């Protein structure tokens, strides 16, 4: 079965998604020591928005974009992670579209037409679209060469939509890529207007020169050069800030950190397991986020339900206040534990 047959239109409203997104935004901000948003005024209110961030911290980069506004965001990701039908459906539910590359096979590139149409429909419905134009993540300094996908989607959107289309370059700068509870600055640059009349001008020029076949290539190249010029200073930009007195703070909250550590034991087990399995350590902080804020609370919710059953059947008679504490405290503690623990252990 082809992948597109498994997928639905990602711009359609989904109640479960709408419930989960506020939770993800809250936990993402809790995970970080601080988040600074710079240049939000550069995001137009009445245009189709295509975000173009640098890619350094795997899943967390996407969460950074999702946490920047109130609207759902449609993302693009490499197609090879969609190979299993179950995973493909989950990613589709999360409003993530597959992008095929030449390494996926020349025949598979035609599937990008469906992705591009879906992206344009999402933009027309008012949802921002985000694609990492470097095509892969890298924690090395500097910007990788930009791929053509973002330019092609932007040009198609400008041709098909009756509203302005802009690419907003985004710089994601983490204080320390190896630290889980680090600081993050998200800087939005000046938008790049994608004018559909530019394509007509290039077509005229190409017709006069007798080379109409290069029109799309010229337009794509021109847009990528503009984007690279805008993105490079954003991802190299550093913010100076005053560090908190880490030693004093650590001493003050150390007793609470010990309790928090107990509630993080399931998460520690998961991260330790995957740390030994993965070769690309750039994924480690993303795994920590999933373990601490998605899987760990579910485990403690199950434990709370088991405790509720035990208390309800009177296996261990306890005062009412102790029973309520035993049942309702684990999940909130599991949610608060990462910020407390990683505030001491960095």
Name each model-derived stretch.
Residues 10:
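Conserved functional hotspots at enzyme active or ligand-binding sites that engage polyanionic ligands
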Residues 13-192, 198-199, 258, 269-346:
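Soluble catalytic domains of membrane acyltransferases
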Residues 244-248, 280:
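Short, membrane-interfacial amphipathic segments enriched in basic
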Residues 247-266:
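Transmembrane alpha-helical segments and their cytosolic interface motifs
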């Amino acid at each position: 079965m082809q992948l597109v047959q498994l997928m639905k239109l990602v711009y359609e409203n989904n109640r479960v998604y709408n419930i989960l997104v506020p939770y993800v935004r809250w936990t993402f901000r809790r995970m970080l020591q601080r988040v600074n948003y710079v240049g939000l005024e550069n995001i137009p209110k009445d245009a189709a928005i295509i975000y173009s961030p640098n890619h350094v911290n795997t899943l967390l980069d996407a969460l950074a974009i999702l946490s920047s506004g109130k609207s759902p965001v449609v993302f693009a990701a490499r197609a090879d992670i969609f190979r299993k039908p179950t995973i493909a459906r989950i990613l589709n539910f999360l409003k993530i579209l597959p992008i095929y590359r030449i390494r996926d096979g020349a025949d598979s590139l035609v599937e990008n037409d469906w992705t591009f149409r879906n992206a344009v429909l999402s933009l027309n419905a008012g949802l921002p679209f985000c694609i990492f134009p470097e095509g892969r993540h890298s924690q090395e300094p500097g910007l990788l060469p930009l791929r053509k996908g973002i330019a092609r989607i932007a040009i198609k959107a400008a041709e098909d939509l009756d509203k302005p289309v802009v690419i907003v370059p985004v710089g994601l700068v983490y204080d320390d890529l190896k630290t889980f509870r680090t600081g993050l600055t998200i800087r939005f640059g000046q938008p790049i207007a994608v004018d559909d009349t530019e394509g007509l001008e290039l077509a005229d020029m190409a017709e006069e020169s007798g080379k109409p076949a290069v029109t799309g290539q010229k337009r794509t190249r021109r847009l990528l050069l503009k984007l690279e010029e805008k993105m490079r200073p954003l991802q190299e930009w550093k913010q100076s800030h005053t560090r908190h007195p880490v030693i004093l703070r650590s001493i003050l909250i150390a007793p609470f950190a010990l309790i928090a550590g107990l509630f993080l034991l399931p998460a520690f087990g998961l991260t330790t397991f995957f740390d030994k399995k993965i070769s690309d350590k750039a994924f480690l902080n993303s795994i920590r986020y999933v373990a601490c804020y998605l899987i760990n609370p579910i485990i403690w919710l199950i434990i709370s339900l088991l405790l509720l059953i035990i208390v309800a059947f009177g296996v261990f008679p306890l005062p009412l206040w102790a029973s309520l504490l035993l049942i309702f405290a684990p999940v909130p503690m599991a949610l608060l534990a990462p910020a407390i623990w990683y505030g001491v252990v960095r």
